[in-house]
Amino acid sequence: MGRTKKVGPAGRFGPRYGMRIRRRVAEIESVQRQKHECPVCHKRAVKRVGTGIWRCTKCGAEFTGGAYYPETEAQRIVRRAIRKALEEK
């Protein structure tokens, strides 16, 4: 019990909260539970340990990121700005 065809794991909420919310939860959780690329070894082996904590199962690298994604939009912007500043030097 707890799964449905349309909303997957968000089916655990049953008829509560409405379809839109349950679809959003299902979408976020499906991406969150996927394996992501490691920033150290570049393998698809990063799994979520806890809220904002991510660990690579191959190289053991542990790092912080977003609650649902290992890299947030803000992190991408900062990384791009740093890279650009280093190139200008």
UniProtKB/Swiss-Prot annotation:
Keywords: Metal-binding, Ribonucleoprotein, Ribosomal protein, RNA-binding, rRNA-binding, Zinc, Zinc-finger. A zinc finger (C4-type) spans 38-59. GO terms for biological process: translation. It holds the Pfam family Ribosomal_L37ae. One of its GO terms (molecular function) is zinc ion binding. Its cofactor is Zn(2+). PANTHER family: 60S RIBOSOMAL PROTEIN L37A, LARGE RIBOSOMAL SUBUNIT PROTEIN EL43. NCBIfam families: eL43_euk_arch, PRK03976.1. Belongs to the eukaryotic ribosomal protein eL43 family. Putative zinc-binding subfamily. This is Large ribosomal subunit protein eL43. It comes from Methanopyrus kandleri (strain AV19 / DSM 6324 / JCM 9639 / NBRC 100938).
